[in-house]
Every structure is written in structure tokens, then in C-alpha cells.
Design a protein with these regions (language model features):
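P-loop NTPase motor domains
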Residues: 1-101, 105, 117, 154-158, ...
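C-terminal regions of RecA-like/P-loop NTPase motor modules
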Residues: 110-170
Length: 170
């Protein structure tokens, strides 16, 4: 079913990838990948995103051959994170720090995420930003933002404003 789409067939049907993720990570290069569901479809987005996350994880883990203090930070930004929130991503979250893989993830609401991924997020994330949220999300996020912000604060936040919890130097 996936190979019926020319875009997907051209990507996954290659013998060798022309994208060297290790070089990108080690040399602080920028890689932008547009996996917009509107362009490639929901299933194709999930397939390619999952494959990419798995490759990024294995590439990050390969960097064990570089002493920790010499590893360069690599920053991964994932918009609409719920589309890629798999068991593999939960593992990436729990091991990212030791491989200097820094993650920034965005999504609309917490219940979009499987419970194991939610647990991995709140167990491993140092910094958190929140715009106005629903009552159910507010109660979950309040646990992360207390004693400074309450569930009521999160629900009544003005448009275009946000609350943050920032982790600096660990």
C-alpha cells in the first residue's frame, strides 16, 4: 500500500540513503524534512516519521564512539509530535541526554499521546512550555509546573502568552 505512492516509493525504494545523519549530527548541520500530512497523507507521514526517528536514534547511539565531552549537541525539532509518538520515541526520550540529542516537541493536547510516551516525556523532559490548555491537560501540566503555576493559571492564560519551566545546566 505504501509503495503505491510515488513519493514514498522513491524514498524507501533506494538501495542507499543519500542523507548521512551521522555527518549531520557530528558537524552541526541542519536538515529540514517536511512530513506534512496534507502533502503525503497521514499513513505515509507516520511511516516516514517513524523510520526517521528510528534512524536518528540509532545514529545518536552510534556516537558512543566519541567521548561524551567531545560529542556535539544535536537538536531535533518535531512539530505535531503526536504523529510520531511511538514506543521508539519513548526510548529516544529516555536515552537522548547521554547521546547529546536535544529534543523539542510540540503537540496540541496531552491525550493525543500514548501513556508510555507521556510517562517518558514527563520523566525526562527538563524544560516545558504551555499555552492555554484544556481543563484535563491543565491538571496534568500543573503537576509539572507547581508551585509556581496552577491548573487555573493554565486554563485562564491569555492568547499568545505562555508559561515555561526551564532547565538550565541539568
Amino acid at each position: 500500500r505504501f509503495i503505491a505512492t510515488a513519493v514514498i516509493r522513491n524514498i524507501i525504494g533506494q538501495v542507499k540513503s543519500t542523507i548521512n545523519l551521522r555527518e549531520i549530527m557530528d558537524n552541526k548541520k541542519i536538515l529540514l524534512i517536511n512530513l506534512a500530512q496534507g502533502k503525503i497523507g497521514e499513513e505515509n507521514c507516520a511511516l516516514l516519521g517513524g523510520m526517521l526517528i528510528t534512524r536518528l536514534q540509532s545514529t545518536a547511539m552510534e556516537r558512543v564512539d566519541i567521548p561524551f565531552e567531545e560529542r556535539k549537541d544535536f537538536f531535533l525539532y518535531v512539530d505535531e509530535f503526536q504523529n510520531f509518538a511511538t514506543e521508539s520515541f519513548a526510548k529516544v526520550l529516555s536515552e537522548a541526554r547521554k547521546f547529546k540529542l536535544n529534543l523539542t516537541m510540540t503537540n496540541q493536547y496531552i491525550e493525543q499521546l500514548p501513556i508510555n510516551v507521556r510517562n517518558a516525556i514527563f520523566g525526562n523532559v527538563g524544560s516545558l512550555a504551555s499555552f492555554v490548555v484544556s481543563q484535563s491537560d491543565a491538571h496534568i501540566l500543573a503537576n509539572e509546573l507547581t508551585p509556581i503555576f496552577s491548573a487555573e493559571d493554565l486554563v485562564s492564560l491569555e492568547s499568545h502568552a505562555m508559561y515555561t519551566k526551564i532547565c538550565i545546566d541539568g
